[in-house]
A protein has these predicted regions:
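Short amphipathic alpha-helices within nucleic acid-binding modules
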Residues: 20, 83-89
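Residues at or immediately preceding the N-termini of alpha-helices
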Residues: 14, 82-83
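Short amphipathic alpha-helical segments
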Residues: 3-7, 69-75
Length: 115
């Protein structure tokens, strides 16, 4: 197996979380998915592993933060142009994300929005 990075995240609602990451461009990898987890690949080597809270707790004794209240991590996804950034954000909103909790930034060489 080639080297990969899988960012493990707790998911309160596995189906809704899976739909959200699919909307962002992830592809479900059935090899690493099941009733308590979903693996979504963004490239051949980079993915997100969503785990139900019960399954996530098998790996840590630390409390699971509330993703709606607490910052848990920040992820940056690249896109080919400004329109692709806006389209990705629109898909994420349809899948349950909240658009622009922070103002959009246009730095000339880079345009970003937040979900």
């Amino acid at each position: 197996m080639s080297k990969m990075i899988l960012v493990n995240l707790p998911a309160r609602d596995l189906a809704a979380s899976t739909a959200f990451y699919v909307a962002l461009g992830g592809t479900v990898n059935p090899q690493f998915s099941g009733e308590t987890s979903t693996s979504l690949m963004f490239t051949d080597a980079i993915g997100v592993m969503l785990l139900t809270h019960d399954h996530y707790r098998e790996f840590t004794k630390r409390p699971i933060g509330d993703a709606r209240r607490d910052s848990q991590a920040m992820f940056a996804l690249t896109a080919v142009d400004r329109d692709a950034v806006d389209a990705t954000l629109a898909r994420a909103v349809v899948a349950g994300g909240r658009a622009d909790p922070n103002p959009a930034q246009d730095l000339g060489f880079m345009y970003n929005r937040h979900i």
